[in-house]
């Protein structure tokens, strides 16, 4: 073929002498023979990256209620949780899968969001149980239950049930692996930028902590206890009464 280097032409002649003429060689079209396809794996960077991630998902278990008891059954030999390559981690910085099982309260919501933010990208979230997805039985009249964890963090897979069986957890993991296998690095990066949260987050207001360590030290409590104790109660320590000591 005109324009080819001598080395390329020599390789082409050697290939035709051993296996016969190559189809498509006249127009320069690339070809893959049967022998080559049986010995060489052709893939893309996205497929290789997704295969490595779906084969070694490391979950962070965030259990707050009875759903976590069903998840604990997977750690035994009856269900063999390790066959999917899932290794539970105790640190969010080493995990790429967050499994939320149980009711999420307004007081625990900042801690949950902090754990999610500490996980490295790419990361996934599974909402396990009715209480996690919608608030469950506490969604009717509770003033502290969050009506769905997706109001705080993005959720990749919902697992309904009260509680879900261990077989349902396996089904959720398999579906998540299929989702990871079809992802692209560029698409995942764009998803993080444009759709950070699935729904509107709660409008939380920071308040002073209820437990201050000064139990029964309020002025009204001290005045009520003095007659019954018959002893002088210690004076109430305030910020104005405590004076810093001068250095000697």
Curated annotation (Swiss-Prot):
Membrane topology: Peripheral membrane protein
Main localization, broad class: membrane
Catalysed transformations (reactions): a plastoquinone + NADH + (n+1) H(+)(in) = a plastoquinol + NAD(+) + n H(+)(out); a plastoquinone + NADPH + (n+1) H(+)(in) = a plastoquinol + NADP(+) + n H(+)(out)
Protein's organism: Synechococcus sp. (strain WH7803)
GO MF annotation list: 4 iron, 4 sulfur cluster binding; iron ion binding; NADH dehydrogenase (ubiquinone) activity; quinone binding
Gene Ontology BP term (one): aerobic respiration
Keywords assigned: 4Fe-4S, Iron, Iron-sulfur, Membrane, Metal-binding, NAD, NADP, Plastoquinone, Quinone, Thylakoid, Translocase, Transport
The protein's assembly and partners: NDH-1 can be composed of about 15 different subunits; different subcomplexes with different compositions have been identified which probably have different functions.
Co-factor(s): [4Fe-4S] cluster
EC number: 7.1.1.-
NCBIfam families: nuoB_fam, PRK06411.1
One GO cellular component, as annotated: respiratory chain complex I
Family stated for the protein in its record: Belongs to the complex I 20 kDa subunit family.
Function, as annotated: NDH-1 shuttles electrons from an unknown electron donor, via FMN and iron-sulfur (Fe-S) centers, to quinones in the respiratory and/or the photosynthetic chain. The immediate electron acceptor for the enzyme in this species is believed to be plastoquinone. Couples the redox reaction to proton translocation, and thus conserves the redox energy in a proton gradient. Cyanobacterial NDH-1 also plays a role in inorganic carbon-concentration.
SUPFAM superfamilies: HydA/Nqo6-like
Protein name: NAD(P)H-quinone oxidoreductase subunit K
Compartments (UniProt record): Cellular thylakoid membrane
Gene3D superfamilies: 3.40.50.12280
Free-text comment on the cofactor: Binds 1 [4Fe-4S] cluster.
InterPro entries attached to this UniProt entry: NADH_UbQ_OxRdtase-like_20kDa, NADH_UQ_OxRdtase_20Kd_su
Binding residue positions for [4Fe-4S] cluster: 66-67, 131, 162
């Amino acid at each position: 073929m005109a324009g080819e280097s001598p080395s390329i032409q020599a390789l082409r002649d050697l290939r035709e002498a051993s296996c016969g003429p190559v189809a498509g060689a006249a127009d320069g079209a690339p070809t893959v023979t049967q022998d080559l396809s049986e010995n060489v794996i052709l893939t893309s960077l996205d497929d290789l990256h997704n295969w490595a991630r779906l084969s070694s998902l490391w979950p962070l278990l965030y259990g707050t209620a009875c759903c976590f008891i069903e998840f604990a059954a997977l750690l035994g030999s009856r269900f063999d949780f390790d066959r999917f390559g899932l290794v539970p981690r105790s640190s969010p910085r080493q995990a790429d899968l967050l499994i939320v099982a149980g009711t999420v309260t307004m007081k625990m919501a900042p801690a949950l969001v902090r754990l999610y933010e500490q996980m490295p990208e790419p990361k996934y979230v599974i909402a396990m149980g009715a209480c996690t997805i919608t608030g469950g039985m506490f969604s009717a009249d509770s003033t502290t239950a969050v009506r769905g964890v997706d109001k705080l963090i993005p959720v990749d897979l919902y697992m309904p049930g009260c509680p879900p069986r261990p077989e349902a957890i396996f089904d959720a993991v398999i579906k998540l692996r299929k989702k990871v296998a079809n992802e692209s690095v560029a698409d995942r990066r764009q998803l993080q930028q444009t759709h950070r949260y699935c729904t509107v987050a709660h409008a939380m207001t920071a308040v002073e902590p209820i437990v201050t360590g000064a139990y029964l030290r309020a002025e009204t409590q001290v005045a009520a206890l003095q007659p019954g104790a018959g002893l002088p109660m210690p004076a109430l320590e305030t910020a104005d009464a405590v004076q810093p000591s001068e250095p000697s």
